[in-house]
Curated annotation (Swiss-Prot):
It comes from Homo sapiens (Human). One of its GO terms (biological process) is proteasome-mediated ubiquitin-dependent protein catabolic process. This is RING finger protein 145. The gene is RNF145. The active site is at 537. InterPro entries: HRD1_E3_ubiq-ligases, RNF145_RING-H2, TRC8_N_dom, Znf_RING, Znf_RING-CH, Znf_RING/FYVE/PHD. Keywords: Endoplasmic reticulum, Membrane, Metal-binding, Transferase, Transmembrane, Transmembrane helix, Ubl conjugation pathway, Zinc, Zinc-finger. E3 ubiquitin ligase that catalyzes the direct transfer of ubiquitin from E2 ubiquitin-conjugating enzyme to a specific substrate. In response to bacterial infection, negatively regulates the phagocyte oxidative burst by controlling the turnover of the NADPH oxidase complex subunits. Promotes monoubiquitination of CYBA and 'Lys-48'-linked polyubiquitination and degradation of CYBB NADPH oxidase catalytic subunits, both essential for the generation of antimicrobial reactive oxygen species. Involved in the maintenance of cholesterol homeostasis. Residues 624-663 have a biased composition (Basic and acidic residues). A zinc finger (RING-type) spans 537-575.
Length: 663
């Protein structure tokens, strides 16, 4: 059953590709220039070419037929192709019969065939061909009335009966007329089929729109037609034909530079229409999806597909290519200019793919560094991919500076590549810190602060680079060529990459400063108080050699409580508000619960849970990106929720951080 479904899926795509190719050909065909060429040629007196408007109408009819073929249900589409195949077989039978009659007229032998070996060979060959045609036609049309397709065998039968050759010519024409009448009868009997199909399709569309709406109808058609795969196959066929046409006309092998130019030129030739441009967009999306899937498979193996079976990635790169192509008017340029512009757009797409690869690798690498996994192969894969993401973007930026004149788009590519390399450098530095802490007997002090400073340095550099890009874009807009699309891109880039990042970084800094001030304002527990308390930290579940005391008389590690205060300003146990003289400006707070009577220090909360009625304070959760969240990764190999075992997990900065993140 699975094989049948796969075959149907393949047919659903393969049978619709010709309709898109027909649309592409009709878009390329200029009717006016075609008639101008006809008028200059000897065909200008042909009545068929005297009616220009008729040809224009036929041009639009071709568009309608292409759209109908594209949207037909699979069963009707298969039936239509079978009818078309039957027509081709009948034409092949006509050609076989006509060639046989011509050969007999050339040799002019009217005697018995068994006396002439050559005549017998011609008869046998034609008879076998006609039998094959008749058999195939009856199989395709699923009928046992084989005589309906055997009219072209009449000249063979007449020759077998020693009919004169002049009469055989007349019989052959009669066979052609008879077959044509059969085709006309079939078309006439099915004349109302398209109308009935259109009527039933209209009823179904109206019902779907009334019940589910236009959006559901569009999504249903999108899934039934498999639009991304369909356009990708269409573009790959165009690209393969372009490559084949080039190599079929050349005898000598091309050099490496020539092959690169051929590759770009072929891509440029295959995106000269809106249909081929959409095909390139979906092809780039699938290529990006494949690269990102291989990246995740390289890092995690088959577990990557078990944890994340549906990777909805790759569309960002395709949409980026489409926006840039529309903005720059790609399909309206000449082939050479189009190839040059495509090279720049593809650089932008590659930079986006590298950034997506880093988004996949960053949490995996940090989780591997924070875990107790000692598999050298896993560490090698993670570090090798990070080294690739460190070197390749820098090399790409260097090549762009070498071969292209600097402008706004190239500056965006170079800045994105540099930021990717810097982010990988920060990821590797944090990974090294985790590994150093793993091999030390004692935990690294202030690990959380070190990680924060590393991330803060990267965020600051990222902000400065984004600011430089905006400044360069504004200067080009003022002193250079001004466009609406360019101004919109600068505005969007300024809002998302400058303003929001600056606002987020400032809030993060204020939250951290407020947490530090709160910790400093709390009293430090003495040795006698710790011995009298004789309990573990309720955040990290580790023994307490030093602790701070909250106003509600609860004991915590200073580092653990500080990380908790990054998230919310309440006691982890009783949720009493920890007041401080310096309130965080711009961040509101909600009413908190009063301390529960008899709340004990040894109350154990599950990870990721909250007491009934308690919600996170809006606006207090820090969102600094994937790397900031990964500094609170659990050290447990099984990644299960629950309480820590103090004997199994030694006291470290990473262990303390885990409950804070889950909170």
């Amino acid at each position: 059953m699975a094989a049948k479904e796969k075959l149907e899926a393949v047919l659903n795509v393969a049978l619709r590709v010709p309709s898109i190719m027909l649309l592409d050909v009709l878009y390329r065909w200029d009717v006016s220039s075609f008639f101008q060429q006809i008028q200059r040629s000897s065909l200008s007196n042909n009545p068929l070419f005297q009616y220009k408007y008729l040809a224009l109408n036929m041009h639009y009819v071709g568009y309608i037929l292409s759209v109908v073929l594209l949207t037909l249900p699979r069963q009707h589409l298969v039936q239509l192709y079978l009818y078309f195949l039957t027509a081709l077989l009948l034409y092949a039978g006509h050609q076989i019969s006509r060639d046989y009659v011509r050969s007999e007229l050339e040799f002019a032998y009217e005697g018995p065939m068994y006396l002439e070996p050559l005549s017998m060979n011609r008869f046998t060959t034609a008879l076998i061909g006609q039998l094959v045609v008749c058999t195939l036609c009856s199989c395709v049309m699923k009928t046992k009335q084989i005589w309906l397709f055997s009219a072209h065998m009449l000249p063979l039968l007449a020759r077998l009966c020693l009919v004169p050759l002049e009469t055989i010519v007349i019989i052959n024409k009669f066979a052609m007329i008879f077959t044509g009448l059969e085709v006309l009868y079939f078309l006439g009997s099915n004349l109302l089929v398209p109308y009935n199909l259109a009527k039933s399709a209209y009823r179904e569309l109206v019902q779907v729109v009334e019940v589910y709406g236009l959006l559901a109808l569009g999504m249903s058609l999108w899934n039934q037609l498999v639009v991304p795969v369909l356009f990708m196959v269409f573009w790959l066929v165009l690209f393969a034909l372009q490559i084949y046409s080039y190599f079929s006309t050349r005898d000598q092998p091309a050099s490496r530079e020539r092959l690169l130019f051929l590759f770009l030129t072929s891509i440029a030739e295959c995106c000269s229409t809106p249909y081929s441009l959409l095909g390139l967009v979906f092809t780039v999306s699938f290529v990006a999806l494949g690269v990102l899937t291989l990246c995740k498979f390289y890092l995690q193996g088959y577990r990557a597909f078990m944890n994340d079976p549906a990777m909805n990635r790759g569309m960002t790169e395709g949409v980026t290519l489409l926006i840039l192509a529309v903005q720059t008017g790609l399909i309206e340029l000449q082939v050479v200019h189009r190839a040059f512009l495509l090279s720049i757009i593809l650089f932008i797409v590659v930079a986006s793919i590298l950034q997506s690869m880093l988004e996949i690798a960053d949490p995996i690498v940090l989780a591997l560094g924070a875990s107790r996994d000692k598999s050298l192969w896993k560490h090698f894969r993670a570090v090798s991919l990070c080294l690739f993401l460190l070197v390749f973007p820098a090399y790409m930026a260097y090549m762009i500076c070498q071969f292209f004149h600097m402008d706004f788009w190239l500056l965006i590519i170079i800045s994105s590549s540099i930021l990717t390399s810097l982010q990988v450098l920060g990821t590797l530095f944090i990974y090294v810190l985790f590994m150093v802490e793993e091999f030390r007997k004692e935990p690294v002090e202030n690990m959380d602060d070190v990680i924060y400073y590393v991330n803060g340095t990267y965020r600051l550099l990222e902000f400065l680079v984004a600011l430089c890009v905006v400044a360069y874009g504004v200067s080009e807009t003022i002193f250079g060529e001004w466009t609406v699309m360019g101004s919109m891109i600068i505005f969007i880039h300024s809002y998302y990459n400058v303003w929001l990042r600056a606002q987020l970084g400032w809030k993060s800094f204020l939250l951290r400063r407020d947490a530090v001030n709160k910790i400093k304002s709390l009293p430090i527990a003495t040795k006698e108080q710790l011995e009298k308390h004789n309990d573990i930290c309720a955040i990290c579940y580790q023994d307490m050699k030093s602790a701070v005391i909250t106003p509600c008389s609860h004991f915590f590690h200073a580092g653990c409580l500080k990380k908790w205060l990054y998230v919310q300003e309440t006691c982890p146990l009783c949720h009493c508000h920890l007041k401080n003289s310096s309130q965080l400006p711009g961040l509101g707070t909600e009413p908190v619960l009063q301390p529960h009577a008899g709340a004990e220090q040894n109350v154990m909360f599950q990870e990721g849970t909250e007491p009934p009625g308690q919600e996170h304070t809006p606006g207090t959760r820090i969102q600094e990106g994937s790397r900031d969240n990964n500094e609170y990764i659990a050290r447990r190999p099984d990644n299960q929720e629950g309480a820590f075992d103090p004997k199994e997990y030694p006291h470290s900065a990473k262990d303390e951080a885990h409950p804070v993140e889950s909170a």
